[in-house]
From Swiss-Prot:
GO terms for cellular component: cytoplasm. Keywords: ATP-binding, Cytoplasm, Magnesium, Metal-binding, Nucleotide-binding, One-carbon metabolism, Potassium, Transferase. This is S-adenosylmethionine synthase. Its main location: cytoplasm. It comes from Salmonella agona (strain SL483).
Amino acid sequence: MAKHLFTSESVSEGHPDKIADQISDAVLDAILQQDPKARVACETYVKTGMVLVGGEITTSAWVDIEEITRNTVREIGYVHSDMGFDANSCAVLSAIGKQSPDINQGVDRADPLEQGAGDQGLMFGYATNETDVLMPAPVTYAHRLVQRQAEVRKNGTLPWLRPDAKSQVTFQYDDGKIVGIDAVVLSTQHAEDIDQKSLQEAVMEEIIKPILPSEWLNTSTKFFINPTGRFVIGGPMGDCGLTGRKIIVDTYGGMARHGGGAFSGKDPSKVDRSAAYAARYVAKNIVAAGLADRCEIQVSYAIGVAEPTSIMVETFGTEKVPAEQLILLVREFFDLRPYGLIQMLDLLHPIYKETAAYGHFGRENFPWEKTDKAQLLRDAAGLK
């Protein structure tokens, strides 16, 4: 493979779309805390001074959607009208209905193992050995930059930072291996009284340098810090936000394919979410086992049907065992039926709000990031 560049981006927890994702998943978590078998599809819209929470929810639980919304916005850091959005005074509107009984009859079964998929669709999972978390480097470091922005904002290191921020990192590859970072973009919302020069210096010293490995930076690396020169108006005042609008940020930064389904606000019966997590789990264990350097899994479903309609394994020529054997290993060691994968990954718990910012993959505290089947796969493949 010739030399090439690859770019991925991320956004902070204060980005409007991510506010929406976090509210949707906070509602989901609150419901799952009381009713693990709830059916939840929660969508959120945010704009200056208001939040609209809608969707289809069938549950025995009662949750205070207004309180959950305000607490989520408050934790993110929008607590004053000067920021254009205030957790204490914004309007919170609710438009919640129940999940269609037509869908329910296709999902619920007397035998849990025969639980049908909540919808048709195709999902992808991916892993690569180019980072320690078996994720693509561009999106991994883009996430870490905006995580660091939130950290120094919240701990008072840079008190003039505001919640909205975006990052973008362009990596240089040679023959498929990382050789450097070509460009870094970091735009952060800020208070009115900080000048551009001071902001750029502080962002470089407190955010960029602590995160990006120095061996990948050189004199030709380009840095774009707040390149418009001003970013005071941000968050929902600058742009409206919607649940599910950052699906590439949420996954692999464009390095792998995407089936199109968003994650946040959906309970695990929705294979858009749970099967994408399972596909990541499969791909990561294959790479961790040393069966391939890169692995992409596709799985697909028909609504109301338990068995996947297809499973595909792509290793981009990096496989250490035949591709046909990899498919057999996946079918032997991973139950990709909806109920099976929910049990395999223990998904009926309130673990989702944390996923809703800084990527659903590559953070070791999530169950789909375990590599507990790597040795089993390696032994079954006959690798020493």
